[in-house]
Amino acid sequence: MIGLLIITHETIGEAYRGLADHFFPNGFPENLHILGVQPDEDQNDIINNAIAALQEFPDNRGVLIMTDIFGATPCNAARRLVRENKSAILIGLNAPMMIKAIQYSSQAENLSDFTETVKEAAIRGIFAITSAPEDLVCKEHG
């Protein structure tokens, strides 16, 4: 099992908890912890809180840390927690990333492979639609 730690600005992570509840109605996964960073929070306090969260995970195959914005405080704190084969980071948290991570973390055995799989899900979940589909027809209600 791979542990999952989400470190985001304020309540963004909690919004993702709600999304997880929607997709996984049998309960919030035990291997997922969320840490919300406050605007005035000290960097060392953030790191200490993250270390405490990491220590709550059972002896497992590593922890994937997901953060929201590259270069921002949550990301900078998380970068200090990376340890080869023990923890990795994905930055740019989105819904497909989180759903894939939750869906497969319990059976994942290799942190590096798992991280790449989750990253690919995040990338494949992004689309740009710049024009209306040609077959879109609105029906009149009558």
Task: Label every model-predicted segment.
Residues 2-64, 70-142:
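N-terminal loops that bind phosphate or other acidic moieties
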